[in-house]
Amino acid sequence: GTADIVIADLPCSGLGVLGKKTDLKYKASPEGIESLVGLQRKILSCVKDFVKPCGVLLYSTCTVNPAENIENVHWFLKEYPEFYLDDIREKLCPELRDSVEEKGCIQLLPGIHQSDGFFIARLKRKPD
């Protein structure tokens, strides 16, 4: 890969934006989420190739569903050991540092962060 950073803001169930799109709660189904997880993994498997050694892959969704968020990150790290979670705590404003769940991941939640629900993971490619 040749990119310093790749941002993968992927299609998701949108469960983090229910306050704005209330119809989503009636459309969400286990089958639909399973299909989205498969699509997210396919996209991640493709875009990782664009990240150069020591480059960053930012994975983000607008959902609070663990299957689409942290579980995808764990899957990705297992499948692609050339990547690791890069600590983001010091890159965040002080108000968000306590929201870091795992070293390189943050889950923003409605009602806590005055925002919609978002998930962001910072995955870094190891040097060659």
Which residues does each PLM region occupy?
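Mobile active-site "lid"/loop adjacent to the S-adenosyl-L-methionine
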Residues: 3, 9-46, 63-68
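C-terminal catalytic and target-recognition region of SAM-dependent MTase-like enzymes
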Residues: 2-7, 11, 50-128
